[in-house]
């Protein structure tokens, strides 16, 4: 247990100095957790080009390039050469590539080989904070009162995962990133979305309607309760049109057997839509507000030096210098 805690202390993130580091940035020579890796490399396009790879499970100091399926660990080239000598050269190993940019949570899942770990299968799954007795006890058989405790379901396993010995920590940090990314939360949208140029008829104006060939037809029963056919005819026969109505904004409504007096016909019902001038005004208002926000930010902008790795600055200030340069450890 103490050895494992000491091993984790060697893998602390160089940016936050609190979380377990999982990736290694070669350009910065820094060990980073997933959250700090995204925070550091999302700053600008130059930082996003830095190549990163998973941190070696053996030395905790170098980027890994191989995955040993026998030991279930990721190794750098030197550690791979030391571990897989003649006695263990038969271990099944495969190379894997690192990544650049700022990948999203689904892209990181694909990189480390956890493609099947989706939102439904356990990425956002957590143990409930309060568990009732009914959730943990199930009946042992019908008619008896033998009960047995059930365990919390484990996380799904993936045999093709290449995240090494720190798979649980990888899943935990990915779960934290998924909460901050709105794209990971999948909300189901309704199948039929109302378009900006259409208005659907109120449902209380109809009786029980049957769906035939994608069109809604009036019911043949209780025709006296529905004077809607005459209303549609009056709208179609009248030459007057409401103001600010586009010519293309009309809906085809098939009418059948209404009051036994109207033959089957198609009536054009005008629908009021928003004009292009209103859209142009809204766009201009949004543009003006964005420009004003930019000017306010420009006034309060301060050009200060930002320290990316504070722990390195503290170590640099404590080291001895000779003529402005760092002295070697062997020098007096």
UniProtKB/Swiss-Prot annotation:
Signal peptide region: none
Keyword annotations: Metal-binding, Nucleus, Repeat, Zinc, Zinc-finger
Binding site for Zn(2+) 2: 56, 59, 79, 84
GO biological process terms on file: circadian rhythm; regulation of DNA-templated transcription; response to blue light; response to far red light; response to light stimulus; response to red light
UniProt subcellular location: Nucleus
Annotated CCT domain residues: 287-329
GO cellular component: nucleus
Zinc finger (B box-type): 13-55, 56-96
PROSITE patterns with a match to the protein in the record: CCT, ZF_BBOX
UniProt keyword Plastid present: no
Molecular-function annotations in GO: DNA binding; DNA-binding transcription factor activity; transcription cis-regulatory region binding; zinc ion binding
Domain of life: Eukaryota
Annotated Zn(2+) 1 binding sites: 13, 16, 36, 41
CDD domains: Bbox1_BBX-like (cd19821)
PANTHER family membership: ZINC FINGER PROTEIN CONSTANS-LIKE 10, ZINC FINGER PROTEIN CONSTANS-LIKE 13
Protein name: Zinc finger protein CONSTANS-LIKE 13
Species, as recorded: Arabidopsis thaliana (Mouse-ear cress)
Taxonomy of the source species: Eukaryota, Viridiplantae, Streptophyta, Embryophyta, Tracheophyta
